[in-house]
Structure formats: C-alpha cells, structure tokens
C-alpha cells in the first residue's frame, strides 16, 4: 500500500512538472480591454457664470496646470490647449495586461499602460479645443473636444517606423487596433479610451 501511495504521489508530481514545463515553452499572457460601454460622458455643460467669469476662470486655471496654451481668442471664445504626460493612466485607459516570459520566468501583471510605458516606449499627446459661448448675461455654455494620440514602438533597441502603432480617439471615445505580434494566449487587439480626466478638470472648475 505504501509503495502504491508513493508511486501515486510521484506520478502526480511528475505530471505537474510536465504541465509547468509545457507552459513555459513560449511567452504567454492575457489582455483584458477597458469597458467601452460607458457612454455617459457629455462634452458640453451650461454654467450659471456669465461669459467673462467663465473665460477668466478657465484661463487662470490652465495657466497654473499641466495644460499648455496653444491659441487663445476671447472674441470667438476659443482656446486651444495641448498636453502630454508620463502619467498617461490619468487620461486614458487601455485595459489590463499580464505575461510570463518562458526564457527568464519574468512576470508582469498590471495596466497595459504600465507595460507600454517601458515595454513599448509609449507616448501620450493630446490637443484640446475649448469653446465658450454666451447664453445670456447670467450663463454660458462650454464645449470641449480633445484629440488623443497614444504612440507605441514595437522595435526595442532601434527605430523602425513600420513597427510603430498609434491609437487615435477623441473625448469620450476609443480605438481598437490589431497589435504587432500579440503574445500567445491573448486576443490580437488592444483598446485605448479616454478617461475624461482632462475634460472633467475644466468642467468641475466652472460648475
């Protein structure tokens, strides 16, 4: 009986090792895209401040923030801002990612942005257009549209534009692309969307 139990335990251990070895013959991973079904974002609001108050509040805020003013025209109520950030996760959401490298055993589990930041040398750039319009002497309307560009490089150690990929989307929007050489076990696409953090920073100011 003891010999039988010993043989059974050994068989289980060997089987377990065989499974582990099989799993590590290639890089494997998993990707979960962000939720793109949330369509509650509105790109315009009406405030109880008049035009001058709203304009001054917005300009003062952006002058002391991460935004850079590209163009400013009070007569037309238009502001064009730009921004880029090493903390892309504040402004966009690209889902969650994990992998195990068979050669080194290295593992990663976290946001796709954290992975792309170091693994794909990702860069976020955005341009925001703000339009402030007078409704009457006591209220105004502010509309915001932002164009996001999130660029990744799939060639490490050298530059090859053919291996660069870019996500382009607007406020409240998203883009899904087929990525170059998706890791085994993951879906072939990646999705990035706006978190509306930048837009809400303006909207919350004038509410």
Regions found by a protein language model. Give the residues of each.
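Ser/Thr-rich, low-complexity intrinsically disordered terminal regions
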Residues: 18-207
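Sec-dependent bacterial lipoprotein signal peptides
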Residues: 1-17
């Amino acid at each position: 009986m003891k010999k039988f139990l010993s043989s059974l335990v050994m068989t289980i251990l060997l089987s377990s090792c065989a499974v582990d070895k099989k799993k590590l013959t290639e890089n494997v991973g998993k990707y979960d895209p962000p939720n793109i079904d949330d369509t509650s974002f509105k790109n315009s609001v009406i405030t109880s401040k008049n035009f001058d108050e709203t304009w001054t509040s917005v300009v003062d805020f952006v002058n002391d923030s991460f935004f850079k003013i590209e163009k400013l025209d009070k007569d037309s109520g238009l502001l064009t801002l730009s921004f880029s950030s090493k903390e892309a996760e504040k402004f966009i959401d690209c889902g969650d990612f994990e992998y195990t490298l068979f050669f080194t055993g290295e593992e990663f589990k976290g946001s796709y942005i954290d992975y792309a930041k170091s693994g794909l040398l990702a860069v976020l750039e955005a341009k925001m257009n703000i339009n402030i319009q007078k409704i009457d002497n006591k209220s105004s309307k502010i509309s915001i549209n932002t164009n996001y560009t999130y660029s990744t490089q799939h060639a490490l150690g050298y530059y090859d534009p053919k291996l660069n990929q870019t996500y382009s989307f607007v406020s409240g929007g998203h883009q899904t692309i087929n990525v170059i050489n998706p890791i085994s076990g993951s879906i072939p696409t990646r999705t990035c969307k706006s978190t509306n953090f930048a837009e809400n920073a303006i909207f919350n100011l004038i509410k």
